[in-house]
A protein has these predicted regions:
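Strand-helix-loop interaction patch of compact alpha/beta domains
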Residues: 1-57
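Glycine-rich adenosine-cofactor-binding loop
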Residues: 322-365
Length: 596
């Protein structure tokens, strides 16, 4: 027997002894009873009788990971509590929630404490307490009571108003967006082009007060009464849907919980349920008895049934971000110049963060030598980097409203279209080529209208011993202020006695994906701060690799860095350093125009 199996056997034995000594009338659950509760023979359990006039049982269940997991409890013979707060499907009690911690060295104490918590919850539910939890965790209680397995996937703005929206009816799910254009863009990004997709009206109803389970509608008539009682101006939107829908329509309820979180719940409304007769029966007319178009919406609703369904929010990831950041970034436009190992990873981080419009620009093809440190893999070799990245990112991040590839250099792009970068909120130059980036810097300072946005330059020092993110605006210090005329930085962070070999294609860059990750995060983080107005150019941040990384390649901290910014010692740190204007820099001689 393995170590963990032995530990479990010992823990279960201790719990069994505690149950026998503590709970009168308790019974061990046999395999058949465990299966009836949705568990297999790898579980152990007991039936613990509940005292009091209402009786019933409490099932104590230990999973295969016990004692390195929490005990579970489920109600038995208590149908009166199956819709009570903190009671989940099949009577399971929600006590500690996901991720609850246990004293894994004292299984009996954990079970005893959890048993007391379960009894306290049952007593509170019997007394009618905890009802405010329905509004705190509304979406979870709605999911508990769904009556149709078809989910609604939504991508909707959290606006506190009712309105008609657009729906695509698929076989596996319905997709709901603010309008047909947004729905088509998301579906095309995720699943590819399909010209046969059709879109229908759906209703989004803002509820000023979220309902408790006994008010959850089980037909369209009850849904209408709920809207009438709980939604300001939601009834005209619902009635319009009732008057114009065909066989089936979707309704999304949206509201704010007691903690301020915006939640969604779904409803499918359809025609009357006619039993199948095996023959072609006439289609029931929900408007019978009225002239066409004159049936009252209340009658149309009463004659239709509804099903509660789960809502799967395709923007749920925004809930893992700081409030409002995702919505702000969704409206930003970014251009990424250079889609190598650095640029590809930064682009991915920005899309994951919610940036809604992005153009990737790179003339080069992806080679086998970069498979180990690029977002692309071996299936993309010999393809243009920008094009391959866009094709990969579109289904991964369908929320992006515009994701475009330009398989050329930025110079060629601007010769073809001088306003190609005109509307960008931020330009990221991750080319790592002094000639191209000094040209971009001079163009920004030229006073023309081709580059209006701030430019965020990012580069790695040799062997990824340090990484730099430098934001330059139309005024103040420029890129050249910190470099010599041929692109040698004035104050490098590292020095390398043994340099990488240089061939006709330029120097070989020695670093792997792990070395690259902090640099990508550094640049993406500053990009987000710039887009959200939390930082402004000129600003430079640097990542200094752990000292053993330098030592492995024979590198060390550069004396000039130590003189200016102090000794990094063991490294492994992020630092912000000045980027002062150089009075002798040529930018002082160039015409400068400040663009708002």
């Amino acid at each position: 027997m393995s170590f963990l199996a032995t530990k479990r056997q010992q823990a279960v034995g201790l719990v069994a002894a505690w149950v026998a000594a503590t709970v009168e009338g308790a019974d061990r659950l046999n395999p058949a009873l465990l299966r009836a509760l949705g568990r297999d023979e790898s579980w152990d359990g007991w039936r613990l009788p509940l005292r009091g006039a209402r009786g019933g049982d409490l099932h104590l269940l230990l999973d295969p990971e016990f004692p390195y997991s929490l005990p579970r409890f489920a109600l038995g013979r208590r149908t009166d509590l199956l819709r009570a707060p903190h009671v989940e499907t099949k009577g399971r009690l929600c006590l500690a929630g996901d991720g609850g911690r246990a004293d894994t060295l004292d299984p009996v104490a954990v079970v005893a404490y959890s048993f007391g918590e379960a009894l306290a919850l049952i007593a509170e539910d019997e007394a009618g307490a905890n009802r405010e939890d329905y509004a705190i965790d509304f979406d979870a209680y709605w999911r508990r009571d769904v009556t149709d397995p078809l989910p609604l996937r939504t991508c909707l703005h959290a606006e506190r108003r009712s309105r008609l929206v657009s729906a695509w009816h698929g076989q596996a799910f319905y997709f709901i967006a603010e309008n047909a254009r947004d729905a088509r863009t998301w579906l095309t990004n995720r699943y590819g082009v399909d010209e046969t997709r059709a879109f229908k009206n759906a209703a989004l109803i803002w509820l000023d007060r979220l309902p408790e389970p006994e008010m959850y509608p089980d037909n369209a008539g009850r849904a209408r009464r709920l809207i009438e009682a709980s939604s300001y101006r939601g009834l005209p939107v619902f009635d319009r849907l009732m008057a114009t829908m065909a066989d089936r329509a979707a309704v999304v309820f949206m509201g704010a919980t007691a903690t301020g979180d915006v939640v969604q719940a779904g409803l499918l409304v359809e025609g009357p349920d006619w039993a199948s007769t095996g023959t072609k029966a006439p289609k029931p007319n929900v408007s019978r008895g009225f002239r066409p178009g004159n049936a009252p919406p209340s009658i149309l609703a009463l004659r239709r049934r509804s099903h509660r369904v789960e809502v799967q929010r395709t923007d749920a990831w925004l809930g893992r971000m700081r409030a409002g950041e995702g919505a702000q970034l969704a409206g930003k436009r970014v251009a990424v110049l250079g889609c190598g190992s650095l640029g590809g990873g930064v682009a991915k981080l920005l899309l994951q963060s919610g940036v809604g419009r992005m153009t990737l620009i790179d003339p080069d093809t992806f080679a086998w030598v970069n498979v180990g440190r690029h977002e692309l893999g071996s299936d993309s070799t010999e393809r243009n980097k920008a094009t391959a990245l866009v094709e990969r990112f579109r289904p991964m991040y369908p929320h992006a409203r515009e994701l475009r590839a330009e398989p050329t250099s930025w110079q060629v792009l601007l010769r073809r279209d001088p306003k190609a970068l005109h509307d960008c909120d931020l330009i990221l130059s991750l080319i790592g080529d002094w000639n191209a980036e000094s040209a971009l810097n001079d163009l920004q300072r030229s006073g023309t209208d081709e580059v209006r946005a701030a430019i965020l330059y990012g580069w790695l020092e040799e062997q990824a011993g340090a990484a730099h993110a430098l934001a330059i605006g139309p005024t103040g210090a420029c890129l050249r202020c910190g470099f010599g005329p041929t692109g040698t930085i004035h104050v490098p962070a590292t020095t390398w006695p043994r340099h990488a070999p240089v061939g006709c294609g330029g120097p070989t860059s020695i670093y792997g994906a792990v070395d690259l990750a902090p640099a990508q995060s550094l640049i993406a983080s500053l990009a987000i701060d710039l887009l959200l107005g939390r930082a402004s150019p000129p600003i430079r941040r640097a990542w200094l690799a752990p000292q053993p990384t330098l030592a492995q390649g024979g590198g060390c901290w550069h004396l000039r860095w130590i003189e200016h910014y102090g000794d990094p010692l063991q490294g492994g740190k992020l630092t912000a350093t000045p980027w002062p204007k150089d009075a002798a820099c040529s930018c002082a001689l160039l015409p400068v125009t400040s663009f708002s």
